[in-house]
């Protein structure tokens, strides 16, 4: 739900959604966080950055004017998602209901196994 709102916001900003829109394999602590609360950890592709993350090539592209414009748009999109959830009772209820369903599936209200 949050991901769909993010995708819509990026499209409104004219950012195409190329590549995978599904689950990406990465190593972050967001998986731990989202077992307890709803969360959003979007990824953006930096045009021209063909190298792997955390390399000099990637840093060069990320630090370019184009990279900064992308991060500005990503921040705006994130703000739009937060605003939508904060000001729209229906969106907020749907997200919290889904989070409760997932927590229950994990074994309890906080995701802890009994």
Segments (PLM) and residue ranges:
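His/Asp/Glu-rich mid-to-C-terminal helical/loop segments that flank catalytic regions of hydrolases
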Residues: 48-104
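Active-site-adjacent substrate-binding region
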Residues: 1-48
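A domain-level signal for the structural core that forms small-molecule/cofactor-binding pockets
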Residues: 101-109, 114
């Amino acid at each position: 739900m949050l991901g769909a709102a993010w995708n819509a916001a990026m499209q409104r900003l004219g950012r195409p959604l190329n590549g995978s829109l599904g689950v990406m394999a990465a190593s972050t602590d967001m998986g731990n966080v989202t077992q307890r609360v709803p969360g959003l950890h979007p990824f953006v592709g930096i045009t021209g950055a063909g190298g792997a993350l955390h390399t000099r090539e990637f840093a060069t592209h990320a630090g370019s004017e184009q990279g900064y414009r992308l991060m500005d748009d990503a921040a705006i999109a994130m703000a739009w998602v937060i605003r939508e959830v904060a000001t729209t009772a229906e969106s907020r209820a749907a997200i919290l209901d889904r989070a409760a369903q997932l927590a229950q599936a994990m074994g309890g209200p906080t995701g802890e196994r009994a």
